[in-house]
Design a protein with these regions (language model features):
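"A position-specific structural signal for the A-helix of alpha-solenoid helical repeats
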Residues: 2, 43, 50, 89, ...
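A broadly tuned, weak detector of single residues within folded domains
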Residues: 38, 84, 160-161
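Long hydrophobic alpha-helical segments typical of transmembrane helices together
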Residues: 138-183
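Short coil/linker segments at helix-helix boundaries
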Residues: 2-36, 46-82, 92-127, 144-152, ...
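Surface-exposed substrate-engagement region within the catalytic domains
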Residues: 123, 131-135
């Protein structure tokens, strides 16, 4: 629950970093206690992934965070192949790395590929077609990898997300975020 509360709240950046790092650490304890529970692995990836997004790419890569995130997402999907959030996160993992360091280096060093980002994001949407975050994150992945070349496609995904009816408070926040991006 802490993970859901951190994202939309305007807070001190150091406090956010500390909280995301804490999520990753608690998830590691959960992984040790519940190694066959997919969400133990997923929340480690989530916490470390969000933490990584807040620090410099050089720092995140030097700390081995990309490998840890990928390892956790792979474990999640091995246990639960239809885990839509993990599919979305793995798509974004590929997109973040390709977008930040380029396709060739991303592929050779981390196995990250633009085509894999596309594949995982599309599968997440197929698994959860009414999920605003799956649409939003796919739009973000397109922009990270392709920039302005895919702006129209990304805008269409945001527009589709905005039209969805939220099923809970987090989805309402996701839709509000999409609306703000479109403004």
């Amino acid at each position: 629950s802490q993970a859901v509360m951190i994202l939309p709240q305007p807070q001190d950046e150091k406090e956010k970093l500390k909280r995301f790092e804490g999520i990753g650490q608690r998830a590691e304890m959960a992984m040790a206690a519940l190694p066959k529970e997919a969400n133990s692995h997923y929340f480690r990836a989530f916490g470390l992934g969000r933490y990584s997004q807040m620090i410099s790419i050089a720092k995140a890569l030097s700390q081995g965070l990309a490998s840890k995130v990928k390892e956790s997402l792979d474990a999640t999907l091995k246990l639960a192949p239809k885990h839509a959030e993990a599919q979305t996160a793995l798509g974004l993992y590929h997109a973040e790395i390709v977008g930040k360091i380029g396709g060739m280096i991303a592929s050779l060093t981390y196995g990250a590929k633009a085509a894999s980002a596309d594949e995982h994001c599309k599968l997440a949407i197929k698994l959860t077609p009414e999920s605003p975050i799956a649409l939003i994150e796919y739009a973000n992945a397109l922009m990270l990898i392709h920039g302005d070349k895919k702006e129209d496609e990304a805008a269409a995904l945001y527009a589709k997300a905005i039209k969805l009816k939220p099923k809970d408070a987090m989805e309402a926040l996701d839709i509000a975020h999409a609306k703000a991006q479109m403004a």
